[in-house]
């Protein structure tokens, strides 16, 4: 696995040792991509003095932030990302490269307009276009006409439709020539604030629930097939402490709160917007706020030791950013085992082809199929 990252900024060589977070042994995964390299190359070749203040958005593991802190020791950087692993990865990479003293203010992506004024803005194109529109609309609240955003992206994702979406959200955009299959989108704010759209509320009538999502949360306006299967097949019994691991909008926890009226719920996700959506949905459905705790974390890495669950519900992702990987699922299963009481249940839903039953048998020594359809399977393991 390549960990050596090289770049030049304002003539300053930036030689860094960068790692993904959490650590992975997959040799095909690294802590940056060509779009990171292209953004820094573009800045270096712009023949302008490197700014002192930056807003860096969607910097997966801190490659951009580390390079800026190396090239300009007095840099004042706001690091904005929705994912907890991005924050932890950036902090770890700064520390391991002797940059722990860099001035970096860590923020999520729910109030970007308040950090944008007077800063040079660098960002990576997110996969979720609703999240992109929301991000740019937030920035439009405070950017003056002529302020520039530089956005790195894979060339295959850039087309006229995307440029039109950007223009509608904040101002006109043009794309550079291709380099290493990436392009830089230069966005010029037009100075007109756009309304930041409020998420719609939708019903799950078969379970008597109302649900809303912030912009970077999966399943924006309907119950996804896996969650639907899971909600119809929750385990029977009395559970006093239930963790919804990778909670998303919290819909599984909402159903668990109905099903287990005496249970305390822990809703955990690495997406700040997911955790906030879950919090809003708990209130939207008039559930007792004293029964729930909402946790923004890398799986269960920082769950207090005193929390011992008798049930963990989990719908594990099979990607991290654009990388297809199973190491997040492995971490979830290991963390769930650690957090469960003896005899506690891990109850998961996953795509049939992912073969999670093999992992669970290896880790727990047991696994049984609870339900399945053409695409998804519900599996259960006992600690």
Swiss-Prot record:
Its EC number is 2.1.1.174. Keywords: Cytoplasm, Methyltransferase, rRNA processing, S-adenosyl-L-methionine, Transferase. GO terms for cellular component: cytoplasm. It is found in: Cytoplasm. One of its GO terms (molecular function) is nucleic acid binding. It catalyses: guanosine(1835) in 23S rRNA + S-adenosyl-L-methionine = N(2)-methylguanosine(1835) in 23S rRNA + S-adenosyl-L-homocysteine + H(+). It is an enzyme of class 2 (transferase). CDD domains: AdoMet_MTases. The keyword Disulfide bond does not apply. Transmembrane segments: none annotated. Specifically methylates the guanine in position 1835 (m2G1835) of 23S rRNA. PANTHER family: RIBOSOMAL RNA LARGE SUBUNIT METHYLTRANSFERASE G (PTHR47816:SF5), RIBOSOMAL RNA SMALL SUBUNIT METHYLTRANSFERASE C (PTHR47816). Belongs to the methyltransferase superfamily. RlmG family. This is Ribosomal RNA large subunit methyltransferase G. The lineage of its organism: Bacteria, Pseudomonadati, Pseudomonadota, Gammaproteobacteria, Alteromonadales.
């Amino acid at each position: 696995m390549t960990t050596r990252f090289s770049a030049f900024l304002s003539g300053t060589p930036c030689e860094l040792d960068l790692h993904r977070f959490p650590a992975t042994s997959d040799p095909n995964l690294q802590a940056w991509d060509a779009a990171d390299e292209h953004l820094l190359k573009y800045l270096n070749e712009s023949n302008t003095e490197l700014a002192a203040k930056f807003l860096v958005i969607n910097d997966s593991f801190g490659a951009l932030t580390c390079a800026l802190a190396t090239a300009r020791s007095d840099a004042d950087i706001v690091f904005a990302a929705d994912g907890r692993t991005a924050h932890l990865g950036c902090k770890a990479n700064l520390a391991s490269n002797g940059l722990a003293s860099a001035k970096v203010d860590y923020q999520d992506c729910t109030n970007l307009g308040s950090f944008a004024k007077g800063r040079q803005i660098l960002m990576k194109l997110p996969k979720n276009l609703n999240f992109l529109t929301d991000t740019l609309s937030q920035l439009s609240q405070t950017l003056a006409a002529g302020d520039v955003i530089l956005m790195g992206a894979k060339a295959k994702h850039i087309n006229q439709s995307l440029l039109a979406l950007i223009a509608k959200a904040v101002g006109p955009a043009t794309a550079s020539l291709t380099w290493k299959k990436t392009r830089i989108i230069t966005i010029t704010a037009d100075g007109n604030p756009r309304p930041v759209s409020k998420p719609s509320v939708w019903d799950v009538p078969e379970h008597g629930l109302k649900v809303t999502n912030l912009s970077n949360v999966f399943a924006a306006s309907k119950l996804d097939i896996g969650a639907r299967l899971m909600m119809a097949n929750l385990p029977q019994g009395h559970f006093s402490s239930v963790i919804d691991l990778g909670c998303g909008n919290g819909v599984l926890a909402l159903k668990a709160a109905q099903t287990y009226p005496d249970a305390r719920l822990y809703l955990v996700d690495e997406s700040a917007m997911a955790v906030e959506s879950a919090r809003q949905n708990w209130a939207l459905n008039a559930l007792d706020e004293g029964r729930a705790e909402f946790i923004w974390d890398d799986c269960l890495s920082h769950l207090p030791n005193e929390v011992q669950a008798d049930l963990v519900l989990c719908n594990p992702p099979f990607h991290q950013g654009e990388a297809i990987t199973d190491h997040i699922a492995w971490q979830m299963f290991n963390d769930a085992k650690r957090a469960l009481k003896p005899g506690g249940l891990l109850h998961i839903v996953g795509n049939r082809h992912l073969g999670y039953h093999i992992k669970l048998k290896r880790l727990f020594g047991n696994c049984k199929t609870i339900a399945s359809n053409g695409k998804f399977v519900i599996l259960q393991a006992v600690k």
